[in-house]
């Protein structure tokens, strides 16, 4: 005889109407990102500091215009001063909150930001990612994304961590490598009537 499979319900009745709503969740707001240093085995992620990172990042990214293909609103840059001006504009924002990805040598090799920050819904996104060729397809490149995701979930208290990639970008496989496999629904998108709101994909 086949063993019965019990599927846990993903909804509960509304206390007044009886209609199904998402399972109850803790609605305590998450914390906003801050100036932390996240240590890994291959390097670290730290708050972007212009004084330390500008020269490092220009050295490893100058002449590699392809790294700006999907951030063409910003780069590529013609010279170091133009790049430094753009980097300085990143430092002042609380959203996106920018971090430098630093190798064991102490030199910055890339940047990433936590953005679209919605503490009340406990949803956050990683974006504005710029990896120099020295960081692409390296253990540190993967580890940096893991460190940011762990920080968002375990320290800040977010429930949903988004990473949006252009489907034709060569780095599209990176999110699943670094964190988790992708699902075909918007899970834990926001808290609604005290429960978890999910948006399923259109029927095919």
Give residue ranges: language-model regions.
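Conserved GNAT acetyl-CoA-binding A-motif
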Residues: 154-164
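Conserved catalytic-core motifs of GNAT/GCN5-like acyltransferases
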Residues: 180-196
């Amino acid at each position: 005889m086949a063993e019965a499979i019990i599927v846990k319900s993903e909804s509960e009745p509304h206390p007044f109407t009886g209609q199904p709503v998402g399972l109850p969740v803790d609605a305590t707001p998450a914390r906003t990102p801050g100036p932390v240093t996240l240590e890994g085995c291959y390097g670290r992620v730290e708050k972007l500091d212009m004084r330390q990172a500008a020269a490092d990042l220009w050295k490893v990214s100058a002449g590699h215009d392809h790294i700006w293909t999907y951030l063409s609103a910003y780069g590529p840059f013609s010279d170091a001063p133009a790049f430094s001006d753009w980097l300085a504009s990143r430092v002042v924002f609380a959203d996106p909150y920018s971090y430098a990805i630093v190798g064991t040598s102490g030199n910055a090799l890339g940047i990433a930001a936590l953005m679209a920050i919605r503490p009340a819904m406990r949803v956050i996104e990683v974006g504005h990612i710029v990896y120099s060729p020295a960081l692409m397809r390296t253990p540190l490149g993967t580890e940096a994304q893991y460190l940011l995701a762990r920080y968002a979930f375990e320290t800040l208290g977010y429930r949903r961590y988004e990473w949006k990639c252009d489907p034709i970008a060569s780095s599209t496989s990176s999110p699943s490598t670094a964190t988790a496999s992708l699902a075909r629904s918007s899970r834990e998108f926001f808290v609604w009537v005290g429960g978890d709101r999910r948006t399923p994909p259109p029927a095919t």
